[in-house]
Each structure stands twice: as C-alpha cells, then as structure tokens.
Curated annotation (Swiss-Prot):
Control of this protein's activity: Inhibited by cyclosporin A (CsA).
Ranges for domain PPIase cyclophilin-type: 35-197
Protein name: Peptidyl-prolyl cis-trans isomerase B
SUPFAM superfamilies on file: Cyclophilin-like
InterPro entries: Cyclophilin-like_dom_sf, Cyclophilin-type_PPIase_CS, Cyclophilin-type_PPIase_dom
Similarity annotation: Belongs to the cyclophilin-type PPIase family. PPIase B subfamily.
Subcellular location(s) of the protein: Endoplasmic reticulum lumen
Length: 213
C-alpha cells in the first residue's frame, strides 16, 4: 500500500512538471532579442526586451533587428528606430511605434524598400506583450509595429506576429496607461532613446500566453 502511495505521488509530480514545461515553452522559438530604452519627456522610464522568432518569420525579424541596430540602405537613407516614438496608444489594445521619419504613423520604411509582403500568419495575437507588424492593408509592411496589451484574435491573418516581450512588460503597461489626445497620441513624448541587438546563444521557446508582468 505504501509503495502504491509513493508511485501515485511520483505520477502526480510528473504530471505537474510536464504541465509546467508545456506551459512555459510550447510556443515559438526566440532566436534573437532586441532592447528598447524608453524615455518619457526626456526622463528614463525603463527597458523593454523583445524576443524575436527568427525561425518562423526570418525576413520580418531581420527587418526589425536591423532597424533596432540602425542601418544605412543602398540608397543612402538611414533606417533606425533610435529616436523614434510610440505615436499611438490605445488602452486594452496596443501601443504602436516605428515611424522613424514622420513620428506620426504616416512614415517609416523597411530595409527591403518602402514596403515588403506579409511573410506568413503562422503566429497569432494570443495575449498581451506580443509584437506584430502594423500595416495599411495586405503586403504593406514597412517599419511600424505594435505591442499588444491584451488578446486580439481579430488581427490574426491580417498582421504578422514575430516577437514577444520577454522583459519589461511593466514598461509597456506604463505606456499603455499614459494620457492620450483625441487621435490616440500620447500627450507626453514616449521615445525610444536607445535600442539594439542582444545575441541569443541558445534559442528558447516561449509560452502562448500573456507576457510576464
């Protein structure tokens, strides 16, 4: 009887451990990371670190990575997120940035040219903290992106998901809760003061859930 109780206990522990492993790493694999150091009206707010899914959407990830590093295109134009702003914020929806030319949602361009096609829609907007491309319709990806602050299934199949916040979701929440005007623009300037690439030595999977707060 005692042996049976021990075996049942071990089985329960195994089931719980398996459930933990699956919940922690049953989603897409992070192959690259980038960081954004955020300032609000020139005052430091904090750092957001985003994991990028280079195996699932390599072209989209490369565009975002190069814009985070900062690059000069063949035509001589500089393309970089550094100094750009989060120009659109909607509570319980998302925060949007990436327009490094006009800073109002009308500009920005990709490393491949003005626009590039939707790579695929394999990944979904399953929760808060997921990174997706903003667009003006099918196959109009440029530089603009958004970070979700809740689950947004109606965006699936329309916007390319390619990353997830792995650190600094509290910074995203602070931006989400900032005062905005009638056009959803933050009243205070929310700027990417610095940004760059963080190498990932060993790719790792993330869970298909909200980013950790």
């Amino acid at each position: 009887m005692a042996v049976l109780r021990v075996l049942c206990g071990l089985l329960l522990v195994s089931i719980l451990f398996l459930g933990f492993v699956l919940s922690e790493g049953n989603g897409p694999k992070v192959t690259e990371k980038v960081f954004f150091d955020i300032e609000v009206d020139e005052q430091p707010l904090g750092r957001i670190i985003i994991g990028l899914f280079g195996k699932t959407v390599p072209k989209t990830v490369e565009n975002f990575k190069q814009l985070s590093i900062g690059t000069t295109l063949k035509d001589g134009r500089t393309a970089a997120y550094k100094g750009s702003t989060f120009h659109r914020v909607i509570k319980s929806f998302m925060i949007q940035g990436g327009d490094f030319t006009n800073h109002d949602g009308t500009g920005g361009f990709s490393i491949y040219g003005e626009r590039f096609p939707d790579e695929n829609f394999k990944l979904k907007h399953v929760g808060a903290g997921w990174l997706s491309m903003a667009n003006a319709g099918p196959n109009t990806n440029g530089a603009q992106f958004f970070i979700t602050t809740t689950q947004n299934p109606w965006l699936d199949g329309k916007h390319v998901v390619f990353g997830k916040v792995v650190e600094g979701m509290s910074v995203v929440r602070q931006i989400e809760n900032m005062q905005t005007d009638s056009r959803d623009r933050p009243v205070k300037s929310v700027k990417i003061a610095n940004c760059g690439h963080i190498p990932v030595d060993v790719p790792f999977s993330v869970s298909n859930t909200d980013a950790a707060e």
